[in-house]
A protein has these predicted regions:
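Segments of small-molecule ligand-sensing domains
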Residues: 65-137
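Active-site proximal loops enriched in glycine and acidic residues that flank catalytic Cys/His/Asp
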Residues: 2-3, 26-29, 50, 129-131, ...
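Short linear motifs at secondary-structure transitions and domain/linker junctions
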Residues: 1-2, 21-25, 100-106
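Residues in flexible loops and secondary-structure boundaries
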Residues: 54-57, 121, 135, 143
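Extracellular/periplasmic periplasmic-binding protein-like sensory domains
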Residues: 11-86
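Residue-level signal for alpha-helical context at structural boundaries
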Residues: 28, 109-111, 145
Length: 150
């Protein structure tokens, strides 16, 4: 796990040590949530998981995200907290469905959500990869809890 400043050093160091072909996976900490094309170019090919809200992928609440950007919130972690609030609000109306149908999924701003056997919400993040200094969402593969394809 590395924050953006440290993560920008990983790829150049791997290239220096002739290990640039190694795949690099990271946590969501690697992406600040702000587009920094020039700074993040050194993170090209790093694969990481993050919430759809941070990756700016198309979601049902696109209007809310656009309105939140008008608030000029300087700290991008507050944007992530806002996404959590949006999901909390939207989940209220579908909790019964998630409880009755264990393989039902809710496509939220924070990821794909479902209720497990213990009635706890679990979240699956979206995968992305830096290309040209920009995070690009990767195609998602849906799996069940037991690892089998649905």
């Amino acid at each position: 796990a590395a924050f953006p400043r440290q993560a920008r050093l990983i790829r150049p160091q791997l290239r220096f040590h002739r290990a640039s072909d190694l795949p690099v996976l990271a946590t969501s900490h690697v992406y600040s949530g702000a587009i920094s094309k020039e700074l993040d170019r050194d993170m090209d090919d790093i694969i990481f998981a993050d919430m759809p809200w941070a990756l700016k992928t198309t979601t049902p609440n696109q209007g809310i995200r656009e309105d939140s950007l008008k608030l000029s919130i300087a700290d991008n972690s507050l944007q992530r907290l806002l996404a959590l609030g949006v999901d909390s609000y939207n989940l209220i109306s579908v909790l019964k469905v998630l409880e009755e149908y264990p393989y039902e999924r809710f496509q939220g701003e924070t990821g794909t959500l479902h209720l497990n056997a213990q009635r706890q919400l679990q979240r699956q993040l979206s995968w992305a990869q830096f290309k040209g200094g920009l995070p690009q969402a990767l195609q998602q593969v849906n799996t069940r809890d037991d690892g089998e394809q649905p």
